[in-house]
């Protein structure tokens, strides 16, 4: 279960609220990935589907799953699940 968000935009997408500056189709893709993240019981669950391109970010203690080639969802992992969840333009 998602524990916390790093910004308001990510939380709005999770709640199904429209975010003007992000295209609707990209918001739908992000919500799909957030749903995968919310359902994960352990980090290993995020290796599927392979399109998540799940990996640890070097030296940060954060992890990443891909939404598309430009956008990612990054987060930390706690005993209770993902925290500090952030939908971000990674480039």
Language-model features: where?
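Enriched for short, Lys/Arg-rich terminal
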Residues: 54-58, 62-91
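Glycine-rich, flexible loop/turn motifs
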Residues: 1, 9, 18, 42, ...
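Compact soluble domain cores
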Residues: 24-51
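Arg/Lys-rich, positively charged N-terminal/basic patches that mediate binding to nucleic acids
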Residues: 1-34
């Amino acid at each position: 279960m998602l524990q916390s968000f790093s910004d308001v935009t990510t939380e709005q997408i999770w709640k199904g609220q429209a975010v003007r500056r992000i295209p609707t189709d990209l918001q739908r893709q992000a919500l799909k990935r957030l749903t995968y993240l919310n359902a994960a019981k352990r980090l290993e669950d995020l290796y599927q589907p392979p399109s998540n391109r799940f990996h640890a970010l070097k030296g940060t203690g954060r992890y990443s799953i891909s939404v598309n080639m430009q956008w990612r969802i990054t987060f930390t992992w706690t005993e209770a699940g993902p925290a500090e969840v952030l939908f971000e333009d990674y480039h």
